[in-house]
């Protein structure tokens, strides 16, 4: 059984965190811009990265440091992507070296991430100068997780953190995470930053398998704006301090751990979709009756990624034709004459399309349903028994404003 707990990225035994303003963000000294997460013990570690061909320097460094499947710490900055910029990998390595010196481990045991403006040289010297102070703030507390969560935010309006507890092999295991993501988010992994910590004892091979499986059903099922970033990374550290027998293969223990990890990541993914830049609505699209799960996911992704559908939800307009249109260009084969569509929220549910044809419906009720903060598009395909749920958000005037002056 999975239970929700407090503590965020510090919920698991042996993990400490900190966040501090060191000067990467020059426009606001009150905004933290560097985060540090450290384990008291060596960790099995894994990560999944952006599929964008243009990858930021920290991704190359982190991939190299993960070659042995082990790590001790994560250092991350916001305000500068360290992508397509001079001395990118050198500066990423300098961040790792500074963190390693401050906490007492090898530079290759530190994973590094960046997020922010692309194409500008990272002021790595201010990170180096602030690292000792940042390390001095490390502690295992909810406040420390909160500080780290805020330190990786860019256009986010709220922090994203969560933690769960479960039982693995008779031992209490905790998993916590922090994430950032508000724009440049599209389901294709990776599409954000997410740092996960756990005290579960699990091999590097199995923690990677669990992360890949989990990303597929969580972060790969969200979309804000259709853009896949150059930097985005989801990583996990597992230090084994829970004391369970090390998971080295599939079985009951692995299934229990995987269930908890998926629950955590789905919650974080929903937080990111809900906090899309300028968004007013969280959109859930559930496609049922598909021929298989992959088909259902492709169609649901297409619907939540549709700019016209997003605009309709922003306007509280039950324009179901845009849903069918997005389904039709998804690349999946299906019979439109079998499709049913309904809109739902806390205010109720209203069918708007049956067997590919529009229904007469109460426009006022539909508007009330779509006025809620969280709305659902329910699609039935009539092609099989498979289903999938994806998450997105509406598009508003504020999205244009935020991104029109992002660099200023």
Residue locations for each model-derived region?
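A structural signal for small-residue-enriched, beta-sheet-centric alpha/beta enzyme cores
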Residues: 1-90, 94, 100-408
């Amino acid at each position: 059984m999975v239970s929700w707990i407090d503590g965020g990225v510090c919920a698991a035994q042996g993990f400490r965190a900190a966040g501090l303003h060191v000067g990467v963000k020059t426009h606001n000294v009150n905004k933290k811009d560097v985060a540090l997460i450290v384990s008291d013990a060596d960790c099995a570690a894994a990560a999944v990265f952006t599929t964008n061909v243009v990858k930021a320097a920290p991704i190359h460094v982190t991939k190299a440091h993960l070659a042995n499947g082990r790590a001790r710490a994560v250092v991350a900055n916001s305000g500068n992507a360290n992508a397509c910029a001079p001395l990118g990998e050198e500066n990423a390595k300098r961040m790792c070296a500074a963190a390693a010196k401050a906490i007492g481990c090898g530079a290759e045991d530190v994973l590094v991430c960046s997020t922010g403006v692309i194409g500008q040289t990272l002021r790595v010297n201010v990170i180096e100068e602030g690292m000792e102070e940042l390390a001095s703030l490390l502690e295992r507390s909810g406040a420390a997780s909160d500080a780290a969560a805020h330190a990786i935010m860019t256009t986010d309006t709220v922090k994203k953190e969560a933690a769960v507890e479960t039982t693995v092999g008779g031992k209490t295991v905790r998993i916590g995470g922090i994430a950032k993501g508000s724009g440049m988010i599209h389901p294709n992994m990776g599409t954000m930053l997410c740092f996960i910590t756990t005290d579960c004892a699990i091999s590097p091979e199995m923690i990677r398998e669990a992360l890949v499986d989990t990303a597929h059903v969580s972060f790969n099922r969200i979309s804000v704006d259709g853009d896949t970033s150059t930097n985005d990374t989801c990583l996990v550290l597992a230090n084994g301090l829970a004391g369970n027998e090390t998971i080295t293969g599939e079985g009951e223990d692995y299934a229990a751990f995987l269930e908890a990890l998926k629950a955590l990541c789905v919650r974080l993914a929903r937080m990111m979709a809900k906090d899309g830049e300028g968004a007013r609505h969280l959109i859930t699209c559930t496609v049922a009756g598909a021929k298989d799960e992959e088909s259902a996911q492709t169609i649901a992704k297409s619907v939540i990624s549709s700019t016209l559908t997003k605009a309709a939800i922003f306007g509280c307009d039950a324009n179901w034709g845009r849903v069918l249109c997005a389904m039709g260009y998804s690349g999946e084969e299906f019979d439109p004459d079998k499709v049913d569509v309904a809109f739902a929220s806390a205010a109720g549910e209203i069918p708007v399309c049956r067997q590919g044809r529009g229904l007469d419906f109460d426009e006022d009720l539909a508007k009330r349903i779509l006025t809620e903060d969280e709305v659902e598009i329910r699609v039935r395909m009539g092609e099989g028994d498979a289903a999938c749920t994806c998450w997105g958000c509406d598009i508003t005037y504020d999205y244009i404003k935020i991104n029109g002056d992002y660099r200023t």
